[in-house]
Amino acid sequence: LLETTPVTHGPLQVYRFKDGLLLLQKADSSGASEGSVVNHFAVEARDMGATLKKLKAAGFDMPTLKPGAAGVFIYGPGGVKVEVMHNPALKANAASHHIHFCHADTVAMQKWYAKTFGGKPAMRNKFEAVEIPGVNLTFTDFKAGSAPTRGRTLDHIGFEVKNLEAFCKKLEAAGVKFDVPYKRVESLNIGLAFLTDPWGTYIELTDGLNRW
């Protein structure tokens, strides 16, 4: 799908594609991404037909792409849900598109992400959304509630932040609590921090990960 060669960093396999990194680590999972706060993530593919053929050849149970449909959902190992969307105008083979949250408190989520990360509130089709450079955050009203992400197949999401140490100090001054406060990891040449949003989404913040 991403047509990229993974780079190994310790226990991590890192896949780079336009505007995003996908990090894989072998671990036990408490459940699929569907049913958690982050229901799925979406990528765009320039050649949808070729992409679906490759996924089918790789063993994925592929749904039929309906005429006029913008994309399809596939389920990877461990139940990670991925939406593949068609964008023939894309210059790269694949690119990140959106992260899709499911929770009953969508308006509050939209406000929190816009304020915390300096995003622009918007609508994506019928959904509340926030535009952040490189990715769209989409929020769907899900009355049944959703489980926290930590420990599930899609364990956390992440954002690359310039001057992360100063950014973390700003969040702390605003009352944000960190699970892992800002620190430098010299062996990886990055700065990082972890926090959990008010609805249970585990979030990694990095400074330098985009150089991997």
Predicted regions and their residues:
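N-terminal, post-signal-peptide region of Sec/Tat-exported proteins
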Residues: 1-29
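Amphipathic alpha-helical segments
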Residues: 1-5, 50-58, 105-121, 173-174
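Short loop/beta submotifs within extracellular cysteine-rich repeat domains
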Residues: 5-6, 22-24, 31-32, 51, ...
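Post-signal peptide N-terminal segment of secreted/secretory-pathway proteins
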Residues: 31-33, 41, 46, 50
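Short glycine/serine/proline-enriched coil/turn segments at secondary-structure junctions
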Residues: 32-33, 90-93, 147-149
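Eukaryotic phosphotyrosine signaling hubs
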Residues: 37-40, 153-156
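Short, surface-exposed ligand-recognition loops at beta-strand->loop->(often short) alpha-helix junctions
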Residues: 43-47, 101-107, 160-162
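Vicinal oxygen chelate
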Residues: 52-101, 123-124, 129-132, 136-142, ...
